[in-house]
From Swiss-Prot:
Positions of Mg(2+) binding: E9, Y55, E63
Gene designation: pafA
Keyword Repeat among UniProt keywords: no
Protein name: Pup--protein ligase
InterPro entries in alphabetical order: Pup_ligase (IPR022279), Pup_ligase/deamidase (IPR004347)
Disulfide bonds: none
Other remarks in the entry: The reaction mechanism probably proceeds via the activation of Pup by phosphorylation of its C-terminal glutamate, which is then subject to nucleophilic attack by the substrate lysine, resulting in an isopeptide bond and the release of phosphate as a good leaving group.
Active site per the UniProt annotation: D57
EC class name: ligase
Annotated metabolic or biological route of this protein: Protein degradation; proteasomal Pup-dependent pathway; Protein modification; protein pupylation
GO biological process: modification-dependent protein catabolic process; proteasomal protein catabolic process; protein pupylation
Organism of provenance: Mycolicibacterium paratuberculosis (strain ATCC BAA-968 / K-10)
Biological classification of the source: Bacteria, Bacillati, Actinomycetota, Actinomycetes, Mycobacteriales
């Protein structure tokens, strides 16, 4: 499958402070954030005009699920649009607090752990063909996902009783299973719950919940692009060396704690390989695969960055990727800060900086400031993101959903939508079932809109 439907779901951390002290509980902050949403959507679980879903997840975490996308830059753009949608709610909520005489600063963090040790996720979704052998996909994909933090981790300072250490991944400490049908209780790497949101006879949806939330656009593109490319190679029957891990959960932590990528991890049968070895195998197969697939500039861009990042890890000289990979950008920032102020990695100010990196408010968040200075690479523009806040992807089913929602809102009609259904809540209860996520034009939807 060279054209693939993809989407990203992001849970955001939330807090409200007043002069540095916590002002409201996360529950209360979430209520203020979603008050405007509830006023027009009558629910804290809504679909937006751009085809995305916005809702309040377990534990007071606002969650934004992008609309269906079918190319990488489109997906990165819609992922960033989610940040802007949430930032807009943040500004509105702060104004409500001020109007009520409460005061306080609301923070939304696109990260994966809070100070209490709780974890929340960034989930990737990839449409795969039902006819494929799911167990083979899992077997080949698992070693890739365990080691890919080397190329797309968000970076984190982990405080241990002995010392503070810089880790590649925020999520690695919180994953407890390899493949499972649960997402919250056990936190697997690949979630197998079969909800395709499409024609179940043709497709299933691969739900990857091991990834970090990325701030850097090129890192997000690399994370999703490499996974989609590995899936494409599996579907095409490309042979891979067997890197089945003895204990994926131990391995994911070991990889996260080793920025050299050289520490050996145990494979099934007593063999060993390093994260760098494993990633090199997938990368070299990808380079070969590019010779046989139809040319695609976005795929070529991510394979180029993949190779440069692996070279950088191997040489430990990150100068050629230090604006493109989240954990590299963050580590460089910490090192500069430590050198300037002569402080240890365990200093609370570094922990503050770690958190501030993920603050999504423009003009305040540290990552945004780095990006404005040209210290973080981009693949989108602000104009494209602004358009994606209100406009669905034009090449997928999301277009139908977005146009239906816009028309129903403009006509003042009561409606219900989900990923596959568009329904007018009138006497006739007219419903259109959109089972093909690749289909952006549908006469049935046009007629439903015209009937308003």
């Amino acid at each position: 499958m060279q054209r693939r439907i993809m989407g990203i779901e992001t849970e955001f951390g939330v807090t409200c402070t007043f002069h540095g002290h916590r002002r409201l509980s996360p529950d209360e902050v979430a209520r203020y954030l979603f008050r405007r949403v509830v006023s027009w959507g009558r629910s804290s679980n809504v679909f937006l005009r751009n085809g995305a879903r916005l809702y309040l997840d377990v534990g007071s975490h606002p969650e934004y699920a992008t609309a269906e996308c079918d190319n990488l830059v489109q997906l990165v753009t819609h992922d960033r649009a989610g940040e802007w949608v949430l930032e807009d709610l943040l500004v509105d909520a702060e104004q409500r607090l001020a109007d009520e005489g409460i005061g306080g600063d609301i923070y939304l963090f696109k990260n994966n752990t809070d100070s209490a040790g709780n974890s929340y996720g960034c989930h990737e979704n990839y449409l795969i063909v039902r006819a494929g052998e799911f167990s083979r996909i899992s077997d080949v994909l698992l070693p890739f996902l365990v080691t890919r933090q080397l190329i797309c981790g968000a970076g984190k300072v982990l405080q241990t009783p002995k010392a503070a250490t810089f880790c590649l991944s925020q999520r690695a400490e919180h994953i407890w299973e390899g493949v499972s049908s649960a997402t919250t209780r056990s936190r697997p790497i690949i979630n197998t719950r079969d909800e395709p949101h499409a024609d179940a006879e043709k497709y299933r949806r691969l739900h990857v919940i091991v990834g970090d939330s990325n701030m850097c656009e090129t890192t997000t593109m690399l994370k999703v692009g490499t996974a989609a490319l590995v899936l494409e190679m599996i579907e095409a029957g490309v042979p891979f060396r067997d890197f089945s891990l003895d204990n994926p959960i131990r391995a994911i932590r070991e990889v996260s704690h080793d920025i050299t990528g050289r520490r050996p991890v145990r494979l099934a049968g007593g063999r060993q390989a390093s994260a760098l070895d494993i990633q090199r195998e997938y990368y070299s197969r990808a380079v070969e695969h590019l010779q046989t697939r139809e040319p695609n500039a976005q795929i070529e861009q991510i394979v180029d960055l993949w190779g440069r990042q692996l070279d950088a890890v191997e040489s430990q000289d990150f100068a050629k990727v230090d604006t493109e990979i989240d954990w590299v950008i963050k580590r460089k920032l910490f090192q500069r800060y430590q050198d300037r102020y002569n402080m240890e990695l365990s200093d609370p100010k570094i922990a503050q900086l770690d958190l501030a990196y993920h603050d999504i408010k423009r003009g305040r968040g540290v990552f945004d400031l780095l990006q404005r200075k040209g210290l973080a690479a981009r693949v989108t523009t602000d104009e494209d993101i602004a358009e994606a806040v209100d406009t669905p992807p034009q090449t997928t089913r999301a277009r139908l959903r977005g146009e239906f929602i816009s028309a129903a809102q403009a006509a003042g009609r009561d409606f219900t939508v989900d990923w596959v259904h568009l329904k007018l809540n009138d006497q006739a209860q007219r419903t259109v079932l959109c089972k093909d996520p690749f289909r952006a034009v549908d006469e049935r939807v046009k007629r439903l809109i015209a009937s308003m």
